[in-house]
Amino acid sequence: MSNQVPEKMQAVVCHGPHDYRLEEVAVPQRKPGEALIRVEAVGICASDLKCYHGAAKFWGDENRPAWAETMVIPGHEFVGRVVELDDEAAQRWGIAVGDRVVSEQIVPCWECLFCKRGQYHMCQPHDLYGFKRRTPGAMASYMVYPAEALVHKVSPDIPAQHAAFAEPLSCSLHAVERAQITFEDTVVVAGCGPIGLGMIAGAKAKSPMRVIALDMAPDKLKLAEKCGADLTINIAEQDAEKIIKDLTGGYGADVYIEGTGHTSAVPQGLNLLRKLGRYVEYGVFGSDVTVDWSIISDDKELDVLGAHLGPYCWPAAIKMIESGALPMDEICTHQFPLTEFQKGLDLVASGKESVKVSLIPA
């Protein structure tokens, strides 16, 4: 390694649920075809929080094995500067030392059924940064982009926390793509957190009849308007189902995109949709959800679609951020040094004062 790169660095290390520690670890060594990156910013995602709190999706239960691994550095939404790379990596990704770059959150194997079909976001091994030992994340001063990674350049002229928002925004845009929105649609987005705000912006870009945002926080509903919502509904104070059905001649919404991960948002969406409507689920749930499946089948014949990660949406997400189309200063509300990672996790968990919380490694 060059003289500019230290031998040791600070990093957050996952030892298991409720046991994340700030430690001094060795700076990772890149292999041929890889790039060493100095991390500039890493966002704290709801998935990070649910992993921290021990959700079965990550740590398993009687119905599924554990997916997350211990002794891993968390962090899958990030941006950094290229510190070291070889000619192979430079030519593959079109990058050079000093460039600001992001990497898509999954590092595909490129050998499985899904990768060979171009569905790399569903790669069978499913190595996401920050959850697997093969792919350590960005809650550290340095990280490595493996040779199999998907890498994109980002403008050096925007704040680092804005650039790191490309990851959640790509996810939002993929969920919008799954909805197959048309010009006459009434689109409802549940949740005005980081994912929901991106969904609102993406849905608005599809030029539907109207985009409606649901949340319980007045400040977030105001932010939703700045992201493109034509109507906002505070579900703690207003009857969303009645309002939406009154707007649509009694039919209901054409599209419902769920981005909260709250169990109550699922039956809410099923009830808000018209017959033959489209439900897109992006939320990551901390517990099981029970619904009346007859609404999906016999009552309404709904299309229920999942959405995962942000395949093929990263260039659009980066362009949207760089263009100033989103109120990024109001979305990226809090930044903390790496030493205060626990404060960041706790702030995200409170769900009240923040929208997007980021860590800024020294």
Swiss-Prot record:
Span-the-membrane segments of this chain are none
| Entry EC no(s) | 1.1.1.-
| Assigned keywords, A-Z | Carbohydrate metabolism, Metal-binding, NAD, Oxidoreductase, Zinc
Its required cofactor(s), as named, are: Zn(2+)
The family database entries (Pfam families) matched by this protein are listed as:
ADH_N (PF08240), ADH_zinc_N (PF00107)
Gene inactivation phenotype reads: Complete loss of the ability to grow on erythritol or on L-threitol.
Metal-binding found in the keyword field: yes
Free-text remark on how the cofactor is bound: Binds 2 Zn(2+) ions per subunit.
Q: Name one GO molecular function term.
A: metal ion binding
Which reaction does this chain catalyze? erythritol + NAD(+) = D-erythrulose + NADH + H(+); L-threitol + NAD(+) = L-erythrulose + NADH + H(+)
The entry marks the following residues as binding Zn(2+) 2, namely: 109, 112, 115, 123
On induction, the UniProt comment says: Up-regulated during growth on erythritol, D-threitol or L-threitol relative to growth on glycerol.
Q: Which residues bind Zn(2+) 1?
A: 45, 76-77
User: Can you cite a GO biological process for this protein?
Assistant: carbohydrate utilization
Pathway assigned in UniProt: Carbohydrate metabolism; erythritol degradation; Carbohydrate metabolism; L-threitol degradation
InterPro entries from the UniProt entry: ADH-like_C (IPR013149), ADH-like_N (IPR013154), GroES-like_sf (IPR011032), NAD(P)-bd_dom_sf (IPR036291), PKS_ER (IPR020843), Zn_alcohol_dh (IPR050129)
Give the main EC class.
Answer: oxidoreductase
Q: Which residues bind NAD(+)?
A: 195, 215
Sorted alphabetically, which Gene3D superfamilies does this protein's record hold?
Answer: Medium-chain alcohol dehydrogenases, catalytic domain, NAD(P)-binding Rossmann-like Domain
Q: What family, per the record?
A: Belongs to the zinc-containing alcohol dehydrogenase family.
Briefly, what is this protein's role?
A: Catalyzes the NAD-dependent reversible oxidation of erythritol and L-threitol. Involved in the degradation pathways of erythritol and L-threitol, that allow M.smegmatis to grow on these compounds as the sole carbon source.
Q: Which PANTHER family match?
A: L-THREONINE 3-DEHYDROGENASE (PTHR43401:SF2)
Q: What is this protein called?
A: Erythritol/L-threitol dehydrogenase
Q: Which organism is it from?
A: Mycolicibacterium smegmatis (strain ATCC 700084 / mc(2)155) (Mycobacterium smegmatis)
